[in-house]
Amino acid sequence: MILCVPGPHPLLAEEKIQRLSLRGIAEDLTEHIMQPLPVPAFPEEPAPTFAAPEPDGSAPQTRDPEEDLLCIAKTFSYLRESGWYWGSITASEAKQHLQKMPEGTFLVRDSTHPSYLFTLSVKTNRGPTNVRIEYADSKFRLDSNYLSKPRILAFPDVVSLIQHYVTSCTTESKSEAPYPPPAPLPPVQKEVAVAAVHLKLLRPLGRRDSIPSLQHLCRLRINRCTTEVERLPLPRRMGDYLKQYPFQL
Protein backbone atom coordinates (compact mmCIF):
# COMPACT_ATOMS: atom_id res chain seq x y z
CA MET A 1 0.00 0.00 0.00
CA ILE A 2 1.27 3.43 -0.92
CA LEU A 3 0.28 6.34 1.32
CA CYS A 4 0.10 9.65 -0.50
CA VAL A 5 0.60 12.80 1.63
CA PRO A 6 0.23 16.28 0.00
CA GLY A 7 3.39 18.35 0.38
CA PRO A 8 3.74 22.18 0.74
CA HIS A 9 3.20 24.15 -2.44
CA PRO A 10 2.19 27.77 -3.26
CA LEU A 11 -1.52 28.41 -3.52
CA LEU A 12 -2.99 29.48 -6.77
CA ALA A 13 -4.67 32.83 -7.04
CA GLU A 14 -8.17 31.33 -7.25
CA GLU A 15 -7.55 29.22 -4.15
CA LYS A 16 -6.42 32.30 -2.18
CA ILE A 17 -9.56 34.19 -3.25
CA GLN A 18 -11.80 31.31 -2.21
CA ARG A 19 -10.13 31.04 1.21
CA LEU A 20 -10.41 34.76 1.83
CA SER A 21 -14.09 34.80 0.85
CA LEU A 22 -14.83 31.81 3.10
CA ARG A 23 -13.00 33.47 5.99
CA GLY A 24 -15.04 36.60 5.52
CA ILE A 25 -18.30 34.63 5.52
CA ALA A 26 -17.30 32.83 8.74
CA GLU A 27 -16.45 36.13 10.46
CA ASP A 28 -19.72 37.66 9.29
CA LEU A 29 -21.67 34.69 10.65
CA THR A 30 -19.82 34.96 13.94
CA GLU A 31 -20.67 38.62 14.31
CA HIS A 32 -24.40 38.24 13.51
CA ILE A 33 -25.35 34.78 14.63
CA MET A 34 -23.08 33.65 17.43
CA GLN A 35 -24.43 36.05 20.01
CA PRO A 36 -25.33 34.94 23.53
CA LEU A 37 -29.07 34.92 24.16
CA PRO A 38 -30.42 36.44 27.33
CA VAL A 39 -31.31 33.79 29.87
CA PRO A 40 -34.67 34.37 31.58
CA ALA A 41 -34.66 34.21 35.32
CA PHE A 42 -36.45 31.23 36.82
CA PRO A 43 -37.21 30.79 40.48
CA GLU A 44 -34.82 28.37 42.07
CA GLU A 45 -36.38 25.17 43.36
CA PRO A 46 -34.86 23.28 46.26
CA ALA A 47 -33.05 20.12 45.27
CA PRO A 48 -34.98 16.98 46.18
CA THR A 49 -33.67 15.20 49.22
CA PHE A 50 -33.14 11.47 49.06
CA ALA A 51 -32.98 9.30 52.11
CA ALA A 52 -29.83 7.24 52.35
CA PRO A 53 -30.55 3.51 52.11
CA GLU A 54 -30.36 1.80 55.44
CA PRO A 55 -27.73 -0.91 55.63
CA ASP A 56 -29.12 -4.40 55.51
CA GLY A 57 -28.57 -6.24 58.71
CA SER A 58 -28.17 -9.63 56.99
CA ALA A 59 -24.55 -10.15 55.97
CA PRO A 60 -23.80 -12.12 52.78
CA GLN A 61 -23.59 -15.81 53.47
CA THR A 62 -20.14 -17.30 53.19
CA ARG A 63 -19.45 -21.00 52.96
CA ASP A 64 -17.40 -22.69 55.62
CA PRO A 65 -14.39 -24.44 54.04
CA GLU A 66 -14.53 -27.06 56.78
CA GLU A 67 -17.95 -28.14 55.50
CA ASP A 68 -16.48 -28.87 52.07
CA LEU A 69 -13.56 -30.76 53.60
CA LEU A 70 -15.88 -32.96 55.66
CA CYS A 71 -18.08 -33.66 52.63
CA ILE A 72 -15.13 -34.62 50.42
CA ALA A 73 -13.53 -36.71 53.17
CA LYS A 74 -16.78 -38.61 53.68
CA THR A 75 -17.03 -39.27 49.94
CA PHE A 76 -13.46 -40.61 49.82
CA SER A 77 -14.25 -42.88 52.77
CA TYR A 78 -17.33 -44.29 51.04
CA LEU A 79 -15.47 -44.81 47.76
CA ARG A 80 -12.62 -46.70 49.42
CA GLU A 81 -15.15 -49.00 51.09
CA SER A 82 -17.01 -49.58 47.81
CA GLY A 83 -14.33 -51.63 46.07
CA TRP A 84 -15.02 -50.06 42.64
CA TYR A 85 -13.04 -46.84 43.15
CA TRP A 86 -9.91 -47.17 41.04
CA GLY A 87 -8.03 -44.10 42.22
CA SER A 88 -5.66 -42.28 39.89
CA ILE A 89 -5.84 -44.42 36.75
CA THR A 90 -5.96 -42.64 33.40
CA ALA A 91 -8.75 -42.61 30.83
CA SER A 92 -6.76 -45.02 28.63
CA GLU A 93 -6.37 -47.49 31.49
CA ALA A 94 -10.07 -47.25 32.33
CA LYS A 95 -10.87 -47.94 28.68
CA GLN A 96 -8.72 -51.06 28.72
CA HIS A 97 -10.48 -52.39 31.82
CA LEU A 98 -13.97 -51.71 30.41
CA GLN A 99 -13.39 -52.62 26.76
CA LYS A 100 -14.40 -56.29 27.06
CA MET A 101 -17.03 -55.77 29.74
CA PRO A 102 -20.80 -55.84 29.05
CA GLU A 103 -22.73 -52.63 28.57
CA GLY A 104 -23.51 -50.88 31.85
CA THR A 105 -20.27 -51.81 33.63
CA PHE A 106 -18.71 -48.78 35.32
CA LEU A 107 -16.01 -47.59 37.69
CA VAL A 108 -15.11 -44.33 39.44
CA ARG A 109 -11.63 -42.86 39.22
CA ASP A 110 -9.81 -39.63 39.95
CA SER A 111 -10.33 -36.96 37.32
CA THR A 112 -7.32 -35.72 35.39
CA HIS A 113 -8.98 -32.31 34.97
CA PRO A 114 -7.85 -29.84 37.66
CA SER A 115 -11.39 -28.49 38.16
CA TYR A 116 -12.94 -31.89 38.96
CA LEU A 117 -12.36 -34.51 41.65
CA PHE A 118 -13.84 -37.67 40.12
CA THR A 119 -14.78 -39.15 36.75
CA LEU A 120 -17.29 -41.88 35.96
CA SER A 121 -16.04 -44.33 33.32
CA VAL A 122 -18.77 -46.56 31.87
CA LYS A 123 -19.12 -49.06 29.02
CA THR A 124 -21.82 -47.94 26.56
CA ASN A 125 -23.18 -49.46 23.37
CA ARG A 126 -20.51 -47.45 21.51
CA GLY A 127 -17.63 -48.35 23.80
CA PRO A 128 -16.18 -46.93 27.01
CA THR A 129 -16.84 -43.27 27.74
CA ASN A 130 -16.12 -40.86 30.57
CA VAL A 131 -18.35 -38.40 32.42
CA ARG A 132 -16.92 -35.94 34.91
CA ILE A 133 -18.53 -35.59 38.33
CA GLU A 134 -18.95 -31.97 39.37
CA TYR A 135 -18.72 -30.76 42.98
CA ALA A 136 -20.32 -27.51 44.18
CA ASP A 137 -21.94 -26.39 47.44
CA SER A 138 -21.33 -29.74 49.16
CA LYS A 139 -23.16 -31.58 46.37
CA PHE A 140 -22.08 -33.91 43.57
CA ARG A 141 -23.72 -34.14 40.15
CA LEU A 142 -22.86 -35.41 36.69
CA ASP A 143 -21.26 -32.76 34.53
CA SER A 144 -23.52 -31.31 31.83
CA ASN A 145 -23.97 -28.21 29.71
CA TYR A 146 -25.26 -24.95 31.14
CA LEU A 147 -28.86 -25.41 29.96
CA SER A 148 -29.27 -28.93 31.33
CA LYS A 149 -27.53 -28.30 34.65
CA PRO A 150 -30.66 -27.12 36.57
CA ARG A 151 -32.36 -30.46 35.78
CA ILE A 152 -29.44 -32.62 36.92
CA LEU A 153 -29.92 -34.09 40.39
CA ALA A 154 -27.32 -33.41 43.08
CA PHE A 155 -26.28 -35.74 45.92
CA PRO A 156 -24.29 -35.41 49.15
CA ASP A 157 -21.70 -37.98 48.03
CA VAL A 158 -20.60 -39.85 44.91
CA VAL A 159 -21.83 -43.29 46.01
CA SER A 160 -25.36 -41.93 46.54
CA LEU A 161 -25.21 -40.42 43.05
CA ILE A 162 -24.11 -43.70 41.46
CA GLN A 163 -26.64 -45.76 43.41
CA HIS A 164 -29.49 -43.50 42.28
CA TYR A 165 -28.70 -43.98 38.59
CA VAL A 166 -28.05 -47.71 39.01
CA THR A 167 -31.45 -48.11 40.68
CA SER A 168 -33.21 -46.12 37.96
CA CYS A 169 -31.49 -48.04 35.14
CA THR A 170 -32.21 -51.39 36.78
CA THR A 171 -35.87 -50.48 37.23
CA GLU A 172 -36.18 -49.47 33.57
CA SER A 173 -34.52 -52.66 32.33
CA LYS A 174 -36.82 -54.87 34.45
CA SER A 175 -39.98 -53.04 33.41
CA GLU A 176 -42.12 -55.14 31.09
CA ALA A 177 -44.69 -52.47 30.29
CA PRO A 178 -44.71 -51.77 26.53
CA TYR A 179 -43.83 -48.23 25.58
CA PRO A 180 -45.75 -46.38 22.84
CA PRO A 181 -43.75 -45.70 19.68
CA PRO A 182 -41.97 -42.33 19.89
CA ALA A 183 -43.18 -39.45 17.77
CA PRO A 184 -41.02 -38.60 14.74
CA LEU A 185 -38.39 -35.97 15.52
CA PRO A 186 -37.47 -32.94 13.39
CA PRO A 187 -34.29 -33.37 11.31
CA VAL A 188 -32.11 -31.34 13.70
CA GLN A 189 -33.30 -33.17 16.81
CA LYS A 190 -32.96 -36.50 14.99
CA GLU A 191 -29.28 -35.78 14.29
CA VAL A 192 -28.74 -34.88 17.96
CA ALA A 193 -30.51 -38.04 19.10
CA VAL A 194 -28.40 -40.19 16.79
CA ALA A 195 -25.18 -38.57 18.03
CA ALA A 196 -26.17 -38.92 21.69
CA VAL A 197 -24.63 -41.67 23.80
CA HIS A 198 -27.03 -43.40 26.18
CA LEU A 199 -25.55 -44.25 29.57
CA LYS A 200 -26.62 -47.31 31.50
CA LEU A 201 -25.22 -47.95 34.96
CA LEU A 202 -25.89 -51.57 35.87
CA ARG A 203 -22.91 -53.15 37.64
CA PRO A 204 -19.70 -51.79 39.17
CA LEU A 205 -16.30 -53.12 38.17
CA GLY A 206 -14.36 -54.03 41.30
CA ARG A 207 -10.62 -53.68 41.55
CA ARG A 208 -8.82 -56.92 40.84
CA ASP A 209 -6.22 -56.23 43.53
CA SER A 210 -8.84 -55.60 46.23
CA ILE A 211 -11.15 -58.50 47.03
CA PRO A 212 -14.11 -57.43 49.20
CA SER A 213 -14.20 -58.95 52.65
CA LEU A 214 -16.92 -61.30 53.80
CA GLN A 215 -18.09 -58.65 56.26
CA HIS A 216 -18.55 -56.12 53.47
CA LEU A 217 -20.47 -58.62 51.31
CA CYS A 218 -22.78 -59.36 54.24
CA ARG A 219 -23.24 -55.63 54.78
CA LEU A 220 -24.27 -55.16 51.16
CA ARG A 221 -26.74 -58.00 51.45
CA ILE A 222 -28.30 -56.49 54.58
CA ASN A 223 -28.52 -53.05 52.96
CA ARG A 224 -30.32 -54.55 49.96
CA CYS A 225 -32.89 -56.17 52.23
CA THR A 226 -33.71 -53.22 54.48
CA THR A 227 -33.13 -49.49 54.82
CA GLU A 228 -33.89 -49.44 58.55
CA VAL A 229 -30.74 -50.96 59.97
CA GLU A 230 -31.23 -49.28 63.34
CA ARG A 231 -34.29 -51.45 63.96
CA LEU A 232 -32.42 -54.72 63.55
CA PRO A 233 -31.60 -56.63 66.77
CA LEU A 234 -27.84 -56.32 66.28
CA PRO A 235 -24.99 -55.50 68.64
CA ARG A 236 -23.97 -51.85 68.67
CA ARG A 237 -20.60 -52.55 67.09
CA MET A 238 -22.21 -54.37 64.18
CA GLY A 239 -24.78 -51.60 63.75
CA ASP A 240 -22.00 -49.02 63.59
CA TYR A 241 -20.25 -51.10 60.95
CA LEU A 242 -23.40 -51.16 58.80
CA LYS A 243 -23.76 -47.37 59.11
CA GLN A 244 -20.23 -46.84 57.81
CA TYR A 245 -21.43 -47.84 54.33
CA PRO A 246 -25.24 -47.52 53.98
CA PHE A 247 -25.34 -48.47 50.28
CA GLN A 248 -26.27 -51.44 48.11
CA LEU A 249 -23.36 -51.34 45.63
Curated annotation (Swiss-Prot):
Annotated InterPro entries: CIS_SH2, SH2, SH2_dom_sf, SOCS_box, SOCS_box-like_dom_sf
Gene3D superfamilies in the cross-refs: SH2 domain, SOCS box
Top-level taxon of origin: Eukaryota
Occurrences of domain SH2 (ranges): 84-165
GO biological-process terms attached to the record: cytokine-mediated signaling pathway; intracellular signal transduction; negative regulation of receptor signaling pathway via JAK-STAT; protein ubiquitination
Residue ranges of the region described as Disordered: 41-64
This protein's UniProt keywords: Growth regulation, SH2 domain, Signal transduction inhibitor, Ubl conjugation pathway
Domain SOCS box: 200-248
Pathway assignment: Protein modification; protein ubiquitination
Keyword Hydrolase: no
GO molecular function: cytokine receptor binding
Pfam families attached to this UniProt entry: SH2, SOCS_box
Role played: SOCS family proteins form part of a classical negative feedback system that regulates cytokine signal transduction. CIS is involved in the negative regulation of cytokines that signal through the JAK-STAT5 pathway such as erythropoietin, prolactin and interleukin 3 (IL3) receptor. Inhibits STAT5 trans-activation by suppressing its tyrosine phosphorylation. May be a substrate-recognition component of a SCF-like ECS (Elongin BC-CUL2/5-SOCS-box protein) E3 ubiquitin-protein ligase complex which mediates the ubiquitination and subsequent proteasomal degradation of target proteins.
Domains as described in the record: The SOCS box domain mediates the interaction with the Elongin BC complex, an adapter module in different E3 ubiquitin ligase complexes.
UniProt cross-references to PANTHER family, sorted A to Z: CYTOKINE-INDUCIBLE SH2-CONTAINING PROTEIN, PHOSPHATIDYLINOSITOL 3-KINASE REGULATORY SUBUNIT
Full protein name: Cytokine-inducible SH2-containing protein
Natural source organism: Gallus gallus
